[in-house]
Amino acid sequence: MKMLDLYGYTSIAQSFDKICISIASPESIRAMSYGEIKDISTTNYRTFKVEKGGLFCPKIFGPVNDDECLCGKYRKKRYRGVICEKCGVEVTSSKVRRERMGHIELVSPVAHVWFLKSLPSRIGALLDMPLKLIESILYSGDFVVIDPIATPLSKGEVISESAYNQAKDNYGEDSFLALTGAEAIRELLVRLDLHAINANLRTELESTTSEMKRKKIVKRLRIVENFINSGNKPEWMILTVIPILPPDLRPLVSLENGRPAVSDLNHHYRTIINRNNRLGKLLKLNPPAIMIRNEKRMLQEAVDALFDSTRRSYVSNKAGSVGYKKSLSDMLKGKQGRFRQNLLGKRVDYSGRSVIVVGPNLKLHQCGLPKKMALELFKPFICSKLKMYGIVPTVKLANKMIQNEKPEVWDILDEVIHEHPILLNRAPTLHRLGIQAFDPVLIEGKAIQLHPLVCSAFNADFDGDQMAVHIPLSLEAQLEARILMMSTNNILSPSNGKPIIVPSKDIVLGIYYLTLQDQAQSEDEVLFFGDFSHVEYALHNKDVHLCSKIKYRMTYCNYDVEGNKPSYYSKIIETTPGRLILWQIFPQHKNLTFDLINQVLTVKEITSIVDLVYRNCGQSETVEFSDKLMSLGFKYASQSGISFGCKDMIIPDTKTMHVDNASDKIKEFAVQYQDGLITRSERYNKVIDEWSKCTDLIAKDMMKAISVYDEENKLNSIYMMAHSGARGSASQMKQLSGMRGLMAKPSGEIIETPIISNFREGLNVFEYFNSTHGARKGLADTALKTANSGYLTRRLVDVAQDCIVVEYDCKTHNGFAIRSVVEGGAVVETLDNIILGRVAAVDVYNPITEELLVKAGELIDEAKVEKIKIAGLDAVKVRSPLTCEAKKGICALCYGRDLAIGDVVSIGEAVGVIAAQSVGEPGTQLTMRTFHVGGTAMRGVETSNLIALLDAKAKLVNSNVVEDKHGNKIVMSRSCEIVLLDSVGNEKMRHNIPYGARLYVNDGQFVKITEKIAEWDPYTMPIITEKTGIIKYMDLIDGVSINEVLDESTGISNRVVVDWKLHLQGANLRPRLVLVDDNGNIITLSNGLEANYFIPIGAVLNVQDGQKVHAGDVITRIPRESIKTRDITGGLPRVIELFEARRPKEHAIVSDIDGYVEFGKDYYRSKRRIFIKPVDDKLTPVEYLVPKGKHTIVNEGDFVHKGDLLMDGDPDPHDILRVLGVEALANYMISEIQQVYRLQGVRIDNKHIEIILRQMLQKVEIFEPGDTMYLVGENIDMEEVIKTNNSMVKMGKSPAKYAPILQGITRASLDTNSFVSAASFQETTKVLTEAAFSGKEDSLYGLKENVIVGRLIPAGTGFLMNKIKKLSLLNKEDYSMYYDSEYQDPALLQSDSNNFGHDLPKGNNNIVDY
């Protein structure tokens, strides 16, 4: 331990390894107590001294004042340990009043409310009695038979009082034993034989067949086994002694007006003591039984109120009502409870807060600290220095000197502050960049100055934001602040690895202006320059302008293959003086050429330049470069004179034409609707589409008009702001000078009359009123969603907090194949973006040259990504946190690159928390951003066709095509896909072609870029005939299963299928269209089945009974819902739904096997049967029940693959896991979650989502227990099961079989191995009850548990400290052996009995050697 003392590391928090919790026995309560309390008196009302024998008795709890007894006889430290013979008080420190407990001996036992009422009731489960019966015994005076002796009554039977008296008369006084109240329950519990119950339940479990009964038995069996294993006795759930909290934890404080403020607990204790004493006196008087029973009930209620007042059914006892007294449970749970208020978050000394202002002249690592603030914060440091230099003799005089602000004080303050970093924090701290360290610079004034480039990390602006300052005191804290938290060390964002110190707003505008080029300049006016000094001179003399075109002699540098021996050559290039000015601040590196900036730089280019500089030149160069870039940006933004002018909003001349065209088309749709050619929802969809197109066209023309470079005004200011990415966007410009477009109602529906005006023209009253919808919804949403998003972050942090990097390599070869992400035909995320920073799971070869590109277990960095890109690979297998085999955490290689530093992650990094923050932080950002577009509908035109994005060869998969009467090829397959292959045959793109689409290419045909491959109607789902024949209606009965729906506005009737189940005669109908030949025989389709087309509710029939149809004709249409706008408002609930692993409301059914679809002949109540017939006839078909009227997306005879959807809707993640396994689940969840974030333009690395998923997949369900003690259907930790199975195999017994299960993040947080962590999260009383009767141990592995008990967290520096601690406990031989062989034999660490966690291989500099 000496080694630990070096670090000041031994304290009470370090002196234990785990925390255990169990039910307190009466003996242990008495042992903890220093005396029994029988009196309710607190303090004397005249002397204000505490009363002896009362609730604050000094004899029991210790002296009120340090080293002073009550009567004042002994008053010095020298009498410590003496017990005063006069007043009986021990002379000691008054601190013991925070530790010493008392107790109350109860005259009659009472039930502990947690074990009685916390569901499932533990007492009820052990006795196998419903809660209602137990309550009737405890509160209503019913009797329970304990021992029937010689009567026909049965043991445990509950009888009313009258029945009890009747039985006494019938059988005699002592012929049976029946009791009431808590004594009865206690007696029953004492007489339980848990081992016998356990054996009986196990035999019963084997014989039972009913699922409900099984679940009930398993529940009870778990509780019984937990009791047996924990060593708790059942009768301890009934209290005979109540402990009393130490008095300083329930203090009596006198207020200013002399009235005492009493803690609520004292009120509860007084009630209990009063009722207990009264009951004791009553019992001596031998009164009628009813009085005793009433008094006992009141005592029971008083004890209930002390432990948990919310569990009582009284109205007056609801929290928040007048007269409500806080119970012990209330003190623990909720945001204001002990866990969350005092243990996980504490107020901090040495801190201050103030408003922030911008500090453009600061360096990146500095912040401006007001002198007044610094003086107060560093006061103790200044005092000690003043004394040390002998300026003042005492601290008191030093304080006086500081108060008077003498000149010496300022000098010393400068010295103290020098290289002493301070922490700045802005609430809400959504990710770790919300707290960063800076070197303070003293400034006048009262506001903190903040560097502009760190604003995006803090999400700060200067409209009145406040920030808090904290001072790291100890040397270690200062060291950590400087090395880990300094703003210069946090250049990259931990969520996506892109720079977060990027210029924005004015800086971008300045750089954009600096790199512009004058388009109107003629070739004759172009000047030649050979040196930068000449360019500066010409600028000074106004011979050239910043944006003028010039010819310049640029020196280039050539490197040989190894990158050494540079050779120089010159080249004349066309550029501008502005770009040359920018080039002067660039660091020199072979990968940073002038071509990078010889273009107009927008925010996107600037970001990639900062990224390049970081990757090539390192951190310090990047910091310097960013600072210079910022000053340049500010300088030229102010010189440019760009401002927002009314004339800059140019309204395109074509606007009226576009609006007229759209109006004409909409009139056409109205006519079609009147003629009954289209339905109401189709017309609505088409109108919305038309206006969307019109708005886009106007916006396009506006951008064309606005981006023209004219001689007079040069470039348009507003265009420059939007184009550079400094402020505003194309959609905002569209609203300013194009057309505001369609608005959304609060419900998400789109109002079909658009706002034709823009803000430049001004809106009319009607338009203004329409646009208020969206604006208000935006503001209301913001308020609601912020809370939702914050709660999501809290749950994510809680589920992932114990995921830490514990070793370098877990040696696994598992991983996932990664492909690029394609959405709607376009590649939205390229392969190289996804695999960058991951580790290859297997060797990666070039398919053509067979050259080894990446070795297995090697990090894929930028250079390797480039190789993979050149090789044209479309999939790479990489390691993933989900497949990592490390125990108690993950390994560095499965995680890959730490995105914030761009290198392999260090051991001890808390990757779980980083993942949670990365996923949660944008949620809050986005929810706060809903109203930025002012509620305009963000919906694009629905995709209705597929266009080739590259020259390629088309290959059709699962295609079943028929030709219609016009010769068009119609897709008849539900799973038709088109794959585009490049010249080598690598798959470049894969698309689904919907059923009913018109196909324009053949299998194997070459398609050119922009060629149309297929098109379809996005608003209806058709049902199409496969052969030519005559239509016959079956079970389509007017008024039952089909209605003529008359459209009031058009007078035309459509035949619509209605819900036939609602009708009496409709019970056995199966509405369908049948295709027959001329002889009336049903036609057989190509798959050998009859041509029956089943029709769902809501479908519109396109054909009459007896009508002749051609192959490829649409016979019915199912209108799709009109699409609502999707912003993160719809998106955040979706993310929450996925992380909570909830079943979607109307989830699609997933096929469990490969096979052919067959519709069941009978209808089953309100369900419809679908059979999947396996290819192998020996296997039995699988049956699915689909709700009637739901549209199945498969036809009879279709071949479906395992995991295909059989009907519309989102699939259930649990089904995907069960049918297709972990990899498919991971792919589904990642793509769904990323889709929501991508919609908002937020980039999150997949590995963060994978880590959360890993935490959600930690439990398995046992379906065959083998020889283990597990029960069928039980959910157990996967690591534990693997461990048990290994030991079973060693003993030659059969192991348990299990399947992984997916838990939502809340469930997973509550089911964690640490009860301390779970209790501090949610449902505190429930978690503690569960933990207590199971006698749980908490080994303090996670971060949260350690914060709560006051230790260093086992991550980062704490990870190393833990290792040192374990090493210090080794004996000398082991210790030296560990260090001797550490680098020679890595296996020693693997099999380390002391469980040090595994180490880095030799040569990695992340380990500090002590």
From Swiss-Prot:
Pfam families: RNA_pol_Rpb1_1, RNA_pol_Rpb1_2, RNA_pol_Rpb1_3, RNA_pol_Rpb1_4, RNA_pol_Rpb1_5. GO terms for cellular component: DNA-directed RNA polymerase complex. CDD domains: RNAP_beta'_C (cd02655), RNAP_beta'_N (cd01609). Binds 1 Mg(2+) ion per subunit. InterPro entries: DNA-dir_RpoC_beta_prime, DNA-dir_RpoC_beta_prime_bact, RNA_pol_asu, RNA_pol_N, RNA_pol_Rpb1_1, RNA_pol_Rpb1_3, RNA_pol_Rpb1_3_sf, RNA_pol_Rpb1_4. Keywords: DNA-directed RNA polymerase, Magnesium, Metal-binding, Nucleotidyltransferase, Transcription, Transferase, Zinc. Zn(2+) 2 binds at residues 810, 884, 891, 894. SUPFAM superfamilies: beta and beta-prime subunits of DNA dependent RNA-polymerase. Zn(2+) 1 binds at residues 69, 71, 84, 87. Its EC number is 2.7.7.6. It catalyses: RNA(n) + a ribonucleoside 5'-triphosphate = RNA(n+1) + diphosphate. Transmembrane segments: none annotated. Its cofactor is Mg(2+); Zn(2+). GO terms for biological process: DNA-templated transcription. It is an enzyme of class 2 (transferase). HAMAP family: RNApol_bact_RpoC. The RNAP catalytic core consists of 2 alpha, 1 beta, 1 beta' and 1 omega subunit. When a sigma factor is associated with the core the holoenzyme is formed, which can initiate transcription. This is DNA-directed RNA polymerase subunit beta'. It comes from Ehrlichia canis (strain Jake). The gene is rpoC.
